């Protein structure tokens, strides 16, 4: 099926195209450095078996070490039913296989809360990500707008409800472990989130004609407390812990959840725990599916370190709300992108002027032409 139009181009409609559309091409310094399937086992894998019993202290220590080192780890034996995971991923793939018009019925551009979109819901981005997404605002339950939840494929809404409930329980359990690792009561982090928000984002990364020129999801840190990511076995999630000098591709593990610490979790630990620096790359052979469940504090929740260790100072100047924290983050990111574009445009203009000057300098000097009467004399 051909794309609906340039305004509604869907990456899933791009099969047969040999080149990447310009809106998806990234600057060279942002392009992938490591292949989607060059897997690393550097990210810790932690079994949660016994988390409510004798192994809790051991699990707590391993989670704390992973957050201090990477801000990212994987968990197995987490208690989320394998059949539920299978249903969620199967129905998600069925949705992205629907005709464009069925998906675009739930277009979430223009500030709509939930639904379908290409690349990102963020405004002002200069380059698009090579992905299609469906977003569910699932908690608080009273704020759900089921009119923004796709009706197709049949049964997906009910599965998303069950999935979000199980992920909320797992997230709270993990936040309890993080609270204890900071020397606090088990419920400290959950209480600091007040009435916790949850957002389920289903990412579909189609095959890409030129995967070396783009990203499925640009480099970033998540704004919230923690994120739980379910991914298939294709590979594409990448992480760095040295500011982007070196990247690794996280080894996909069937049924595991990748846990990312977000900016809020970083601030609440007073910087002890890293906010995971990550991105997603794509490939030209197969599509990839991942499902990210973002656990965020309530918009008016107070952002301030819960635990400041002896000899440390708070990493924030003053307490702020999560809404203000998020606003500042988006403002910084967009300002950085704007300044980068301005610098790129300025460099291109300088190069053009230099080329023009070189062309003038290389041109042969004009020779004087004799008058006609002298030529004929």
From Swiss-Prot:
The record's listing under Gene3D superfamilies reads:
B-lactam Antibiotic, Isopenicillin N Synthase, Chain (2.60.120.330)
Q: Which annotated residues bind Fe cation? A: 220, 222, 278
The record ties this protein, via SUPFAM superfamilies, to:
Clavaminate synthase-like
Question: Could you tell me the keywords of this UniProt record?
Answer: Dioxygenase, Flavonoid biosynthesis, Iron, Metal-binding, Oxidoreductase, Vitamin C
One function term, GO molecular function aspect: flavanone 3-dioxygenase activity
Free-text function comment from the UniProt entry: Catalyzes the 3-beta-hydroxylation of 2S-flavanones to 2R,3R-dihydroflavonols which are intermediates in the biosynthesis of flavonols, anthocyanidins, catechins and proanthocyanidins in plants.
The family this protein is said to belong to = Belongs to the iron/ascorbate-dependent oxidoreductase family.
Name used for this protein in its record: Naringenin,2-oxoglutarate 3-dioxygenase
List the PROSITE patterns.
FE2OG_OXY (PS51471)
Q: How is the cofactor bound?
A: Binds 1 Fe(2+) ion per subunit.
What this protein catalyses is: a (2S)-flavan-4-one + 2-oxoglutarate + O2 = a (2R,3R)-dihydroflavonol + succinate + CO2
Alphabetically, which GO biological process terms does the record hold?
flavonoid biosynthetic process
From the UniProt record, give the pathway where this protein acts: Secondary metabolite biosynthesis; flavonoid biosynthesis
Source organism per entry reads: Hordeum vulgare (Barley)
The EC designation for this entry is 1.14.11.9
Organism ancestry: Eukaryota, Viridiplantae, Streptophyta, Embryophyta, Tracheophyta
Q: Where is the Fe2OG dioxygenase domain?
A: 193-297
The UniProt record gives the binding positions of 2-oxoglutarate as: 288
Which cofactor names does the annotation list?
Answer: Fe(2+); L-ascorbate
Q: Which domain of life is it from?
A: Eukaryota
């Amino acid at each position: 099926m051909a794309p609906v139009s340039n305004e509604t181009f869907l990456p899933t409609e791009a099969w047969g195209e040999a080149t990447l559309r310009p809106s998806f091409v990234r600057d060279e310094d942002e392009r992938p450095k490591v292949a989607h399937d060059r897997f690393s086992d550097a990210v810790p894998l932690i079994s949660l078996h016994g988390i409510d019993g004798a192994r809790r202290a051991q699990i707590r220590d391993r989670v704390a070490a992973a957050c201090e080192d990477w801000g990212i780890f994987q968990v197995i034996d987490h208690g989320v039913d394998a059949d539920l995971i299978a249903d969620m991923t199967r129905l998600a793939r069925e949705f992205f296989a629907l005709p464009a018009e069925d998906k675009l019925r739930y277009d979430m551009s223009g500030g709509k809360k939930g639904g379908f979109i290409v690349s990102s819901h963020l405004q002002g981005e200069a380059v698009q990500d090579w992905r299609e997404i469906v977003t569910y605002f699932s908690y608080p339950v009273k704020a759900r707008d089921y009119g923004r939840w796709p009706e197709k494929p049949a049964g997906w809404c009910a599965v998303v409800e069950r999935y979000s409930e199980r992920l909320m329980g797992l997230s709270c359990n993990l936040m309890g472990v993080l609270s204890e690792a900071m020397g606090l009561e088990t419920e400290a982090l959950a209480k600091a989130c007040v009435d916790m928000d949850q957002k389920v984002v289903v990412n579909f990364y189609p095959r890409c004609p030129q995967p070396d020129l783009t990203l499925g999801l640009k480099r970033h840190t998540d704004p919230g407390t923690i994120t739980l990511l379910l991914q298939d076995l294709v590979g594409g999630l990448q992480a760095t812990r040295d500011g982007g000098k070196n990247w690794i591709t996280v080894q996909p593990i069937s049924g595991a959840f990748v846990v990312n610490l977000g900016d809020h979790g970083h601030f609440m630990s007073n910087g002890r725990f890293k906010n995971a620096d990550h991105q997603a790359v794509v490939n030209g052979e197969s599509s990839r599916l991942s499902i990210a469940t973002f656990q965020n504090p309530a918009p008016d929740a107070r952002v301030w370190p819960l635990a400041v260790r002896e000899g440390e100072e708070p990493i924030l100047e003053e307490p702020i709300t999560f809404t203000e924290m998020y606003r500042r983050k988006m403002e910084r990111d967009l300002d950085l992108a704007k300044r980068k574009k301005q610098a790129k445009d300025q460099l291109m203009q300088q190069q053009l002027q230099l080329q023009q000057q070189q062309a003038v300098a290389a041109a042969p000097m004009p020779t004087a032409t004799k008058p006609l009467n002298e030529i004929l004399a």
